[in-house]
Design a protein with these regions (language model features):
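Assembly/oligomerization interface modules of large self-assembling protein complexes
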Residues: 2-89
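Short loop/turn segments at secondary-structure transitions that flank enzyme active sites
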Residues: 53-56, 88, 97, 119, ...
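Short helix/loop capping segments that flank catalytic or ligand/cofactor-binding pockets
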Residues: 55-59, 101-102, 193-196, 261-262, ...
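Extended oligomerization regions of viral-like shell subunits
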Residues: 41, 142, 146-287, 293
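Protruding loop/beta-arch "assembly-hinge" segments enriched in small, turn-prone residues
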Residues: 1-19, 25-30, 37, 61, ...
Length: 324
C-alpha cells in the first residue's frame, strides 16, 4: 500500500496555505493595490519610462524663412531597472499548540506572515525603510523631499496646523506642474482628521465622503485616498510604524509613475527538521512555516520638457505643522 511520506505531507501543507499567504500579502501591501504591478520573469528587468516630452511648433508658409520649416523634436525613454529582492519571515509554533487549537493556526500563521511582508514592502516604498540598495529609485518621500516639493500643514480659522485640506491642494498643485496627481496617501488616522475638517461656519468640508476607485479608501479633492497602518521591524528587533508621522502627514503622487515588480516564485515552505533562530524544531517538537516573496520598485521621475533637462518628482509631501 502506498504511503504518504514526510516530503509529500510538507508539499500538501505548502500548497494548502500558499493562497492564504498570497491573499494576505495583497491585502496588506497597499502599494500593490495602488500602483501598477509588473510580473517579473527574472530577477532584473529593464523598463522603458518616458523621460522627455516633445514640443510642437507653429509653421509658417514661407519657402525661405526658418519659420516655414517643420521642426524636429524627440521623445526619449530612460531605462528604469526593476531588481527583485527577497522579503522573508519564519514563524515557528509548538506541535502541542497546533493539536490543542480549535482554529486553523497554520492558516493564521500564513495570514500573519503575509501581512508582515506586505507592511515591510509598504515601508520601503513609502519612506525607504530598510530599502534594498539595489533599488536605485528613491522612496516616495525621499523623491519629494529632494525635489523640494514639500508643504507644511498651515493654519485654518485661527487653529494652528489645522489646514490639512489646503495643504493637500498645494501639494497636488506642485505635482501637477509636470505630472498628473491621482492619489493621496496617509496614515490610518488621517481619514478621521479629514472627516473632521470644518469650514468657517463649522460645517464638514467633506460631506458626504466621496467614493473613490476600486482599491482606494475614498476620495478627497479628486484624489483617491489610501491609508496605511501597522508596524515593521525597526532594525533592532523592535517596532517602527509603516507610516512615519514624524516626517509626513500625507503624500500626493501620480500613480502612473510608480511600478511595483513581483516575482512569481512567492513561496510557503513547511519546516519540521530545521534549526530556526537557535531552536532545533525536532528537539522541541515544533514546526514552522517559512514565507518568502521577491519584490522590486521603480519611480519614473525627472521628466524633461522639450530639450531642457529637468529634475522633478511625481510626488509631493505634506509635513506636520512646525509650530509658530
Amino acid at each position: 500500500m502506498a504511503d504518504t511520506n514526510r516530503t509529500d505531507a510538507a508539499a500538501l501543507i505548502q500548497e494548502a496555505y500558499s493562497d492564504v499567504f498570497l491573499d494576505s500579502v495583497s491585502e496588506t501591501a497597499k502599494v500593490i493595490g495602488t500602483f501598477p504591478v509588473y510580473n517579473m520573469g527574472t530577477k532584473t528587468t529593464n523598463l522603458p519610462v518616458l523621460s522627455t516630452f516633445p514640443h510642437a511648433k507653429w509653421v509658417g508658409e514661407s519657402a525661405t524663412a526658418p519659420e516655414g520649416v517643420k521642426p524636429t523634436a524627440k521623445a526619449t525613454w530612460a531605462n528604469k531597472t526593476l531588481v527583485a529582492e527577497e522579503l522573508a519571515v519564519i514563524l515557528p509554533i509548538h506541535e502541542n499548540v497546533l493539536a490543542d487549537a480549535t482554529e486553523d493556526l497554520l492558516a493564521e500563521l500564513a495570514r500573519m506572515g503575509g501581512a508582515s511582508i506586505g507592511r515591510a514592502l509598504d515601508a520601503a516604498v513609502l519612506f525607504g525603510h530598510q530599502k534594498p540598495v539595489t533599488w536605485a529609485s528613491k522612496s516616495l518621500f525621499e523623491s519629494a523631499d529632494d525635489a523640494g516639493q514639500v508643504v507644511a500643514v498651515g493654519n485654518s480659522n485661527g487653529v494652528e496646523g489645522d489646514d490639512i485640506s489646503g495643504s493637500i491642494l498645494q501639494a497636488a498643485e506642485m505635482v501637477a506642474d509636470v505630472y498628473d496627481p491621482s492619489h493621496l496617501l496617509g496614515y490610518s488616522g488621517l481619514r478621521y482628521r479629514l472627516a473632521n475638517q470644518r469650514d468657517a461656519n463649522g460645517q464638514p468640508l467633506f460631506q458626504p465622503y466621496m467614493q473613490g476607485t476600486p482599491g482606494s479608501d475614498g476620495m478627497v479633492h479628486g484624489l483617491n485616498t489610501v491609508f496605511f497602518s501597522g508596524n515593521v521591524d525597526d532594525g533592532s528587533n523592535g517596532d517602527a510604524p509603516v507610516w512615519d508621522r514624524d516626517v509626513a502627514s500625507a503624500i500626493v503622487v501620480d500613480r502612473s509613475r510608480v511600478v511595483i515588480g513581483v516575482r512569481q516564485d512567492i513561496t510557503v515552505k513547511y519546516l519540521d527538521q530545521a534549526t530556526v533562530g537557535g531552536i532545533n524544531l525536532a528537539e522541541r517538537d515544533m514546526v514552522a512555516l517559512r514565507f518568502c516573496g521577491r519584490f522590486a520598485y521603480a519611480l519614473g521621475d525627472n521628466i524633461a520638457q522639450g530639450r531642457v533637462a529637468a529634475e522633478n518628482s511625481p510626488v509631493a509631501v505634506i509635513t506636520p505643522y512646525a509650530g509658530s
